[in-house]
Amino acid sequence: MAQTTNDIKNGSVLNLDGQLWTVMKFQHVKPGKGPAFVRTTIKNVLSGKIVDKTFNAGMKMEFETVDNRTLQYSYEDGDNFVFMDMTTYDQIMVPKTLLGDKAKFLLEGTDCLVSFHDGTPLSVDLPGSVVLTITHTEPGLQGNRSNAGTKPATVETGAEIQVPLFINEGDRVKINTEDGSYTGRENN
């Protein structure tokens, strides 16, 4: 649907030269001299490449409609992850490449937001944080305090993260899915 650059918002999907781009940040700028413009940071939906792009204000551009659905992760099948729509019980194959490094925090039963364009999955967003069980870590030394440093630990999905020295095997920890950082310990 044709609109202008004045309609750009965070999350808008633009069709530029036949490729889909998601607007991550935008700013309408009206300088003292010269015409107004829109400064954006956009992300290529397929490749994940992020670029800064400036558009003249009022310029016509093609916006695309994206369907967002909450799906539950079921299992891995070759080069795909299989998600289930819990309202229709349809199984949907999503290429592993759409998750990238975040796949290491994907646990069976996790609800994810999957974006579709013309029935094709474009992106998968995990929850902001997940709770996983520590399956392997070296024991901390006696007298360690919560701010005394970190050690490597492996969680149930096989991902390796850094945790405080007081964390032990079997502990459930909260992990930020954006950067893989430890954010806290959950009550068992």
Curated annotation (Swiss-Prot):
It comes from the Bacteria. Pathway: Protein biosynthesis; polypeptide chain elongation. One of its GO terms (biological process) is peptide biosynthetic process. It holds the Pfam family EFP_N. SUPFAM superfamilies: Nucleic acid-binding proteins (SSF50249), Translation proteins SH3-like domain (SSF50104). One of its GO terms (cellular component) is cytoplasm. GO terms for molecular function: translation elongation factor activity. Keywords: Cytoplasm, Elongation factor, Protein biosynthesis. It is found in: Cytoplasm. PROSITE patterns: EFP. InterPro entries: Elong-fact-P_C (IPR015365), NA-bd_OB-fold (IPR012340), Rib_uL2_dom2 (IPR014722), Transl_elong_fac_P/YeiP (IPR020599), Transl_elong_KOW-like (IPR013185), Transl_elong_P/YeiP_cen (IPR001059), Transl_elong_P/YeiP_CS (IPR013852), Transl_elongation_fac_P (IPR011768). Belongs to the elongation factor P family. Involved in peptide bond synthesis. Stimulates efficient translation and peptide-bond synthesis on native or reconstituted 70S ribosomes in vitro. Probably functions indirectly by altering the affinity of the ribosome for aminoacyl-tRNA, thus increasing their reactivity as acceptors for peptidyl transferase. This is Elongation factor P. It comes from Bifidobacterium longum (strain NCC 2705). The lineage of its organism: Bacteria, Bacillati, Actinomycetota, Actinomycetes, Bifidobacteriales.
